[in-house]
Regions:
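Conserved CoA-thioester-binding segment of acyl-CoA-metabolizing enzymes
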Residues: 2-62, 97
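Terminal peptide-recognition signature
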Residues: 23, 27, 41-42, 59, ...
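Short, hydrophobic secondary-structure boundary micro-motifs
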Residues: 33, 68, 213-214
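Hydrophobic alpha-helical membrane-association signature
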Residues: 38-41, 88-91, 121, 194
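Glycine- (often His-adjacent) and acidic-residue-rich active-site loop
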Residues: 51, 61-98, 114, 142-144
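Crotonase-fold acyl-CoA enzyme core
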Residues: 97-211
Length: 214
């Protein structure tokens, strides 16, 4: 049984299939780059999911990208915006913490590029399934920034300090197959099989004991 799509958001969408909540980044025209408005919607959507009877969260992106990173200056934004670091601290990082602290398992279906903070969103999940065409990128070094969104905490713990430094300092694309070899993702599947695989895993977790989410 599938619930109706939640239409109260502009930049994210929530759907429910049985006890699996599907949270989709829904701004394909900007490759699902996370604007402050989208992050606010994400926070509200996560609250909705926490209040629901969902037993597992599946997160993915609409269109050809999972998430192109943080869009700190969305189109039409006025001058005089606060510094990027301040925006990250007040908008982005609290949502990352909120996701991380959810008491249900999380699966990510990485349908395309996962860049910058979008990479952190992808790999913070308990189970990460990537499309074969997907890639991961920490591009901060190219613009003189340190990795954000929890990457400096997550990456060394998942793939080890040496490879985390390589990703951060060289800012090279990491193809899905290499990410699998490195232990960054759990499974790589053909693009047209991604949601089937991810939903199958999410349903399995949703039907498991609640202790899986703790």
């Amino acid at each position: 049984e599938t619930a109706e799509l939640n239409m109260s958001y502009e930049n994210v969408a929530i759907d429910y299939i049985d006890h699996v909540a599907i949270l989709k980044l829904n701004a394909p025209e900007v490759l699902n780059a996370l604007s402050p408005n989208m992050v606010q919607e994400l926070s509200s959507a996560i609250t909705d999911i926490i209040r629901s009877d969902a037993r597992c969260l599946l997160i993915t992106g609409e269109g050809r990208a999972f998430c192109a990173g943080a869009n700190l200056q969305p189109k039409g934004a006025a001058d005089g915006l606060p510094p990027a670091g301040s925006v990250l601290e007040t908008h982005y990082h609290p949502v990352m913490t909120k996701l991380r602290n959810m008491e249900i398992p999380m699966v990510s279906a990485v349908n395309g590029p996962a860049v910058g903070v979008g990479m952190s969103f992808a790999v913070m999940a308990d189970i990460v399934v990537a499309a074969r065409s997907a890639y991961f990128l920490q591009a901060f070094a190219n613009i003189g920034l340190v990795p954000d969104g929890g990457a400096t905490h997550l990456l060394p713990r998942i793939i080890g300090w040496r490879r985390a430094v390589e990703l951060s300092m060289l800012a090279e694309r990491l193809p899905a197959e290499t990410a699998l070899d490195w232990g960054l993702v759990n499974r790589v599947v053909d693009d047209d099989k991604l949601m089937e695989e991810a939903l199958g895993l999410a349903a399995r977790l949703a039907n498991g004991p609640r202790s899986l989410g703790l």
